[in-house]
Design a protein with these regions (language model features):
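Hydrophobic positions on the alpha1 helix immediately C-terminal to the Walker A/P-loop
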Residues: 50, 54
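Inter-motif core of Ras-like GTPase G domains
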Residues: 142-148, 159-180
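Hydrophobic micro-sites
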Residues: 2-5, 188-249
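P-loop/Walker-type NTP enzyme "switch/lid" segment
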Residues: 2-16, 20, 24-31, 40-44, ...
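Conserved beta-strand segments of the P-loop GTPase G domain that flank and frequently precede/overlap
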Residues: 37-39, 119-120, 152-153, 175-178, ...
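Conserved lysine of the Walker
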Residues: 47
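Aromatic pocket-lining residues of Rossmann-like dinucleotide-binding sites
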Residues: 58
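Switch/connector loops and helix/strand junctions flanking conserved nucleotide-binding motifs
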Residues: 76-77, 126-128, 184-185, 211-216
Length: 249
């Protein structure tokens, strides 16, 4: 089975460099850090954007990577990135957690070399029983030795319990923050929940940093990871749309 990703925007030079730095830093975290959860404090912070670009960056440095879309309540990843599925009867993570699909049925190659994906599948309103079913342990146990890196894109941490539960199955957490939006209280609460899972915060990514607000005329947003950043070029009209309607995560 294969997925075709039809709406994956190319990054500019700074974007490639920043994600290369981020993926390299994460790969240097140690051999015991393979399952990396990517989450945020609230919807529309850009966690899925970071997850997808991490998948691409890891694959470009020669690592075999698996991206798991674990937002089984409200995933927009397939729609946003125009992911076309060859098999119309594809079953995703939800179906596997419910015991209605096998592991080999939910993993698919993408058109990016070295990069495989598991999509969320059918969305559900109540996810707690599925995440706690024991099948998540089974999944990670089966794939951890097949890949160099596993990126797990989860719902935002805090509003619902899903991300905190999934964190317990991962080796560390990357937290995506939205510039001029994420509050200190939200950040503290997110870190507290991650720490209660017993897993380390591997780093934070500052997303949608707008240089216009700081007197520098630039039609771009900067995204920071520690001392690295990239610009995602966007027009003023896109910024206007952001004010009227939040971009889907």
């Amino acid at each position: 089975m294969k997925f075709e990703i039809t709406k994956f925007q190319s990054l500019n030079y700074m974007g490639h460099e920043a994600f290369n730095t981020l993926s390299a830093n994460l790969s240097f975290a140690g051999g015991d850090i393979k399952k990396i959860m990517v989450t945020s404090c609230s919807p529309h912070d850009g966690k899925s954007f970071v997850s997808m670009n991490l998948m691409r960056s890891f694959s470009q440095i020669g690592l075999k990577v698996l991206l798991i879309d674990a937002d089984i309540r409200a995933s927009m990843l397939q729609k946003r990135y125009g992911i076309k599925i060859q098999d119309e009867g594809y079953k995703g993570l939800t179906e596997f957690l419910a015991g209605r699909a096998k592991i080999e049925e939910i993993i698919a190659q993408t058109d990016i070399p070295n990069a495989d994906m598991i999509l969320a599948g059918k969305t559900v309103n109540i996810s707690f029983p599925l995440i706690n079913s024991g099948h998540l342990d089974e999944l990670f146990g089966a794939v951890v030795d097949q890949y160099d890196i596993i990126v797990v894109d989860t719902p935002p941490i805090g509003a619902i319990i899903d991300a905190a539960l999934i964190a317990a199955h991962c080796d560390g957490v990357l937290l995506v923050l939205r510039s001029n939006y994420t509050t200190q209280a939200e950040l503290k609460d997110a870190i507290s929940q991650i720490e209660r899972s017993g897993k380390p915060v591997l780093g934070t990514v500052l997303n949608q940093f707008d240089t216009w607000k700081f007197g520098k005329k630039s039609e771009s947003h900067k995204y920071y990871y520690n001392n690295s950043y990239y610009r995602d070029n966007s027009s003023k009209s896109e910024k206007g749309k952001e004010k009227k309607k939040k971009n889907k995560d």
